[in-house]
Amino acid sequence: MDFNMKKLASDAGIFFTRAVQFTEEKFGQAEKTELDAHFENLLARADSTKNWTERILRQTEVLLQPNPSARVEEFLYEKLDRKVPSRVTNGELLAQYMAEAASELGPSTPYGKTLIKVSEAEKRLGAAERDFIHTASLSFLTPLRNFLEGDWKTISKERRLLQNRRLDLDACKARLKKAKAAEAKATTVPDFQETRPRNYILSASASALWNDEVDKAEQELRVAQTEFDRQAEVTRLLLEGISSTHVNHLRCLHEFVKSQTTYYAQCYRHMLDLQKQLGSSQGAIFPGTFVGTTEPASPPLSSTSPTTTAATMPVVPTGAVLAPPEEAALCLEEVAPPASGTRKARVLYDYEAADSSELALLADELITVYSLPGMDPDWLIGERGNKKGKVPVTYLELLS
Amino acid sequence: MNIMDFNVKKLAADAGTFLSRAVQFTEEKLGQAEKTELDAHLENLLSKAECTKIWTEKIMKQTEVLLQPNPNARIEEFVYEKLDRKAPSRINNPELLGQYMIDAGTEFGPGTAYGNALIKCGETQKRIGTADRELIQTSALNFLTPLRNFIEGDYKTIAKERKLLQNKRLDLDAAKTRLKKAKAAETKSSSEQELRITQSEFDRQAEITRLLLEGISSTHAHHLRCLNDFVEAQMTYYAQCYQYMLDLQKQLGSFPSNYLSNNNQTSGTPVPYALSNAIGPSAQASTGSLVITCPSNLNDLKESSNNRKARVLYDYDAANSTELSLLADEVITVFSVVGMDSDWLMGERGNQKGKVPITYLELLN
C-alpha cells in the first residue's frame, strides 16, 4: 500500500511537472531545448514517409478492390482472424452470364458462338485479375502495412519518450535557474544585516540551504541530460532506419510493378487469342446467319465483317502510336505467332509497287508477311513465291 | 346531352368488353372454355424474345459492374442520368494512386532511388487511369447503350404488341363462345359476323407481333457487332496498359545506377555500423529482385524472336561445346530458340555461337 501510494504520488508529481513545463513553453515563459537540424530533418522525413505510405496503401487498396462494401467485408474478416472466402471477380461473373446467355440463345448461332468465346476470355481475364490482386496484396500492401503497424509504432513510442525526457530536462534547467537566483539573492543579504548577530546566523543558514538546493538541482540536471541524450540517440537510430525502409519499399514497388505487368501481359494475350478466334469464325458467321435469318436481317449483318476486320487491324496502329520504331516492331511481333515469326495475309486491294523495294499486290491473293526491326511500322516485308518486298499494312488482312 | 350520352355509351361498351375478356380468361383458367393456341413458330419466337431480354439485361448490368465496381459511383451516375445532367468527370482510382505516388516521390526526393521510382510509377498509373477512362467511355457508348436501347425501346414495343395480341385472342375466344351458345338464327348471324371481325383483327395482330419478334434476329446481329466493339475496346485497353508497364519496367531497370547514387548520398551521412549492416542485406535483396525482373523482359524477347544486345555481368566458363564462354562487361548478341530451356538463350560473339545463361546477362535495347 505504501509502495503503491508513493509510486502514484511520484508519477503524479512527474506528470504535473511536465504539464507545467509544457504550458510555460507555450506561453513563452520557459526556454525549450532545440533538437539539432539533422535530427529535425530525420523527424520530418519519417513523418513524410508515414503519411505518404499510408495514402499509397489506402489508394492501392481502392485500386485493387473499388467496391467499398467488399473492402469493409475483408476488413472485418481480417479483424476476426478468419480466412476471407474467395470471391468471384466481376469479370468472372460477366463470363458466367455470357456463357449462360449463349446456352439459352443457341450455342450454334453466330451471336451465341461469339458469346461463348468472349465469356471464356472474360473468365481468364477475371482469373488474371484475381491473381493480380492476391500477388499485389502479398508483395506490396502487406509490407507497407507492416511498416505502419510495426516500425512506425515503435518510432512513435520512442518519440513520445523523447518528448517526455526533454520536458524533464527543461524542467530541471528551470529549477536550477531558480535555485541559483535564490542563492545569489541569499548571498547579498548579509551586506545589510552583518551588524546584527542573530540575522547573521539566519543569513548564513539560508545561504547554506540554497547552496544545497543548487547542488541537488545540478545533480538532477545531469541525470536528466544523460537520459535525454540516450533517448535522443535511440530515436535517431530508429529514424535513420527509414533509409532501409525506403529501400525495402522500393523493392516492394518493383514487385508491384512486376505483378501489374504480368497481369496486363496475360490480359493482352487473352484478348489476342480472342480476336484470333473471332477473326477465324468470321467466315463461319456469315453463311450460318444467312441461312438462318430472313432477308431483312441480312443487311445489318453484312456490316459485321468490316467491323470484325477493323477490330483486327487497329492492333497495329495502336502499337505504332505507343512505341518508338524499335518497340513498334516489337509490339507488332506480339501479334505474330512466336513459333515461326511469319504470318499469312490476304490482300484486300490492288497495290502497285512504287519502287523496286516494294511488292505489287493483287486483291484476294495470299502472301507471307513478317516484320523487321527498325522498319517503318506501317510496312511489312511480303513474300510471294520467290518475290519479296515491302507491303503496306493497311492493304492486308492478317490471318492466324 | 349528346356528349353525355356519347360518353356513357362508350363507357358501357368498354366495360362490356372488359367484362367479356375477364369472363373468358376466368373460364380458360377453370378449364371451361376453349383457348386458341398460337402456332408453334410464334411460340418459339416469343420464348426467344423473352430469353434475349432477360440475358441482355443481365449482361448489361454485369458489364456496368465490371467497368465501375463501386456501387456508390454507379448510383451517382444513375441519378445524374435521370436528372438529365452531365456527370462530372471524376478522377478514377489509378489516376489518384498515380497522383499520390508522384507527390510522395517529390517529397521523398526525386534524386533518391525510392522517390525516383515512385514518380515513374505514378506517371504510369496515371496513363493507365486515362486508358481505363477511355475503356469505360468506349464500352458505354458502343456496347452498353445499344443493349439499353434494345431493352427500353424494341423490347417495350414487343411487349406492348404482345399484350394487344393477348387481348385480341381473348376477344376472339369470347366471340367463339358466344357463337356456340347462340340459338336464334338472327343471333347466330350476328355472332358469326362478330367472329369474323375478331378473327381478322387477331390475325392482323398476330402478323404484326410475328414481324416484330422476327426482328430479334437482327437484334442478335446488332448485339454481335456491339460485342465485337466491346472486345476491341478491351483489346485496346490491355494493349495500352501492357505497353505502359513495359515502358515502366525499362525505366526502372536502370535502377542500379540510381541505387548507387542513393547509396553515395546515404553514405554522406554518418551511419552507425549496425545500420550499415541493416541496409546491406536489403540492398542485396533489391539487386536480386532486379535480376528477377529480367526474366519478364526475356519473355518479351522470346516472343519477339528478335536479336538483342546483352551485356555480360559475370565471367562464365562453358561447361560443354554447346555453351559459349563469357567475360564480364562484354557485349554479345542474343536470341531465343523455340523449345529451349527458358533459363538459356543463344549467344553470338563474332562467329562463335552457343548457349548462355540468362541470369548472367543484362539485356540492352
From Swiss-Prot, chain A:
Modified residues (Phosphoserine): 10, 400
Annotated ranges, domain SH3: 340-400
Region (Membrane-binding amphipathic helix): 1-27
Residues of the BAR domain: 24-287
SUPFAM superfamilies (UniProt xref): BAR/IMD domain-like, SH3-domain
UniProt main location, coarse: cytoplasm
Gene3D superfamilies registered for this protein in UniProt: Arfaptin homology (AH) domain/BAR domain, SH3 Domains
Pfam families registered for this protein in UniProt: BAR (PF03114), SH3_9 (PF14604)
GO CC annotations on file: cytoplasm
Subcellular location: Cytoplasm
InterPro entries per UniProt: AH/BAR_dom_sf, BAR_dom, Endophilin_B2_SH3, Endophilin_SH3RF, SH3-like_dom_sf, SH3_domain
Entry-annotated residues carrying N-acetylmethionine: 1
Coiled-coil residue windows: 205-234
Protein family: Belongs to the endophilin family.
Subunit relationships: Homodimer, and heterodimer with SH3GLB1.
Protein name stated in the entry: Endophilin-B2
Species whose genome carries this gene: Mus musculus (Mouse)
Lineage, top ranks: Eukaryota, Metazoa, Chordata, Craniata, Vertebrata
Curated annotation (Swiss-Prot), chain B:
Location of the region described as Membrane-binding amphipathic helix in the Swiss-Prot/TrEMBL record: 1-30
Region (Required for membrane binding): 1-37
Domain BAR: 27-261
Subcellular localization: Cytoplasm; Golgi apparatus membrane; Mitochondrion outer membrane; Cytoplasmic vesicle, Autophagosome membrane
Signal sequence range: none
Modified residue annotations for Phosphothreonine: 145
SMART domains the record matches: BAR, SH3
SH3 domain boundaries: 305-365
GO CC annotations, alphabetized: autophagosome membrane; cytoplasmic vesicle; cytosol; endoplasmic reticulum; Golgi membrane; membrane; midbody; mitochondrial envelope
Claim: Nuclease is one of the keywords in the record: no
PTM note: Phosphorylated at Thr-145 by CDK5; this phosphorylation is required for autophagy induction in starved neurons and facilitates homodimerization.
Alphabetical UniProt keywords: Acetylation, Apoptosis, Coiled coil, Cytoplasm, Cytoplasmic vesicle, Golgi apparatus, Lipid-binding, Membrane, Mitochondrion, Mitochondrion outer membrane, Phosphoprotein, SH3 domain
Classification via PROSITE patterns: BAR, SH3
Coiled-coil regions listed: 155-186
A biological-process GO annotation: negative regulation of intrinsic apoptotic signaling pathway by p53 class mediator
Modified residue annotations for N-acetylmethionine: 1
UniProt domain comment: An N-terminal amphipathic helix, the BAR domain and a second amphipathic helix inserted into helix 1 of the BAR domain (N-BAR domain) induce membrane curvature and bind curved membranes.
Purpose of the protein: May be required for normal outer mitochondrial membrane dynamics. Required for coatomer-mediated retrograde transport in certain cells. May recruit other proteins to membranes with high curvature. May promote membrane fusion. Involved in activation of caspase-dependent apoptosis by promoting BAX/BAK1 activation. Isoform 1 acts proapoptotic in fibroblasts. Involved in caspase-independent apoptosis during nutrition starvation and involved in the regulation of autophagy. Activates lipid kinase activity of PIK3C3 during autophagy probably by associating with the PI3K complex II (PI3KC3-C2).
The protein's name: Endophilin-B1
Protein source organism: Mus musculus (Mouse)
Gene: Sh3glb1
